[in-house]
């Protein structure tokens, strides 16, 4: 998406011979175009892949996000749950405690298959299940046997329409993706978030460790239901009444506009914005609103792309419980700047990573107070659990109840993730867990 929209803008600019742009600006645009082409991966194919005479069909798209009905009297609902509810998060299954040898992969797969409904019910009740000590999941084929034995239904990465997350085995249409293992991102603390892009969100995910980092690199999880309960009622009320929206992309490469005659700057900005908007909205399956700003990168002019307004709390589609479904911890530029003081700069150094910089606002585009941002950060971090995974360990999580993230690390880290559109027996689980008497 980014490469297409940016190059379209530059192509349009090059045809505007009425505007005088100095050679430095032209070189800057050309350099960025080459950089973006080099650093932006080609989206994965949606055609079947033929490998060793076996046709691999691509998984289906991630399902549409289930926003549900509005929650009336959100603060009253919070107080009722706070008075009556105590969550256990996560559930844990230790292979050794089952009486199964760590290297007996056949017995491990048999256990997973025979207890699939119980494990999936734990995922729904507890929000996440941590499985430890299973040799079965130490490699990709075994990991795929694991989630197939559970009856999980794989889907494409929700980023599919806008970029390409690398796959673990490097093959197109592979269902197991890299989980942000790049050495260049080791100083980047990945804030807590639910996985969704635009209109699509997986129902569940399984994160697996194929190789643990020498230092750090813990997988982070937090219970969205507990975050909802722990929020200050006034902050909760403000957020829910005004909704939220994300800035999902920034194009900070338009300094050259300052070198255009003043009378032509506004018309040129209109042309750029119109071309970029048309290109981006033709690529993604959600509406993107572009707006001009300054100061994102060393005072540079930028185009900021904002997604539609959405609620920060939703009712869980299976159990009906209210849960925090908001990525402020990972998307807020202010919170990321605060973390830079602890972990160092995020290293937004190249074209692709700069474009991927994000932020969050109220749904009416108002700025969120620093005090409210820091309160949300404190509540989130209070609920974060650092899961140090060893080879073969898996965290099976419900994407609506469980937020996830990743700690900084040193060394070589090889974690993978599979996304799921649903699972076998979902309606049966829903009938046993959903209560019409929920507040």
Annotated model-derived regions:
Residues 3, 27-29, 34:
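Basic polycationic patches enriched in arginine
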Residues 142-144, 169-176, 200-203, 217-220:
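Short, conserved acidic/polar surface loops in the N-terminal third of protein domains
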Residues 155-189, 194:
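A gly/proline- and charged-residue-enriched helix-loop-helix capping module
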């Amino acid at each position: 998406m980014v490469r297409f929209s940016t190059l379209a803008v530059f192509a349009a600019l090059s045809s505007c011979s009425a505007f005088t742009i100095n050679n430095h600006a032209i070189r800057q645009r050309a350099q960025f175009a080459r950089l973006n082409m080099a650093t932006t991966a080609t989206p994965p194919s949606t055609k079947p892949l033929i490998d060793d005479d076996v046709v691999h069909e691509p998984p289906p798209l991630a399902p549409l996000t289930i926003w549900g009905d509005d929650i009336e009297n959100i603060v009253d609902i919070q107080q009722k749950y706070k008075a009556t509810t105590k969550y256990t998060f996560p559930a844990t299954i230790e292979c050794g405690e089952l009486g199964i040898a760590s290297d007996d992969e056949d017995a491990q797969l048999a256990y997973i298959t025979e207890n699939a409904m119980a494990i999936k019910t734990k995922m729904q009740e507890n929000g996440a299940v941590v499985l430890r000590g299973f040799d079965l999941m130490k490699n990709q084929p075994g990991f795929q046997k694991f989630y197939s034995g559970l009856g999980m239904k794989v889907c494409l990465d929700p980023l599919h329409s806008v970029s390409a997350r690398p796959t673990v085995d490097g093959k197109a249409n592979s269902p197991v993706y890299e989980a942000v293992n790049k050495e260049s991102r080791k100083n980047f603390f990945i804030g807590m978030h639910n996985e969704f892009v635009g209109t699509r969100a997986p129902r569940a995910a399984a994160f697996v460790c194929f190789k643990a980092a020498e230092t750090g690199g813990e997988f982070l999880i937090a219970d969205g239901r507990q975050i909802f309960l722990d929020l200050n009622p006034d902050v909760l009320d403000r957020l829910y009444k005004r909704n939220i929206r994300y800035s999902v992309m920034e194009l900070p490469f338009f300094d050259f506009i300052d070198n255009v005659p003043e009378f032509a700057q506004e018309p040129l900005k209109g042309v750029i914005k119109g071309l970029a908007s048309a290109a981006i909205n033709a690529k993604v399956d959600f509406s993107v609103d572009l707006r001009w700003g300054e100061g994102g990168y060393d005072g540079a002019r930028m185009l900021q792309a904002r997604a539609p307004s959405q609620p920060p709390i939703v009712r869980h589609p299976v159990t009906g419980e209210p849960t925090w479904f908001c990525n402020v911890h990972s998307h807020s530029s202010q919170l990321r700047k605060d973390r830079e003081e602890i972990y160092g700069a995020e290293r937004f150094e190249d074209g692709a990573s700069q474009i991927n910089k994000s932020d969050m606002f109220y749904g009416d585009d108002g700025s969120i107070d620093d005090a409210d941002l820091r309160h949300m950060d404190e509540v989130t971090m209070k609920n974060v659990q650092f899961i140090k995974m060893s080879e073969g360990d898996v965290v099976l999580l419900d994407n609506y109840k469980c937020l996830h993230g990743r700690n900084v690390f040193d060394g070589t880290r090889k974690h993978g993730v599979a996304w799921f559109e649903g699972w076998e027996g979902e309606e049966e689980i829903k009938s046993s867990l959903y209560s019409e008497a929920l507040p």
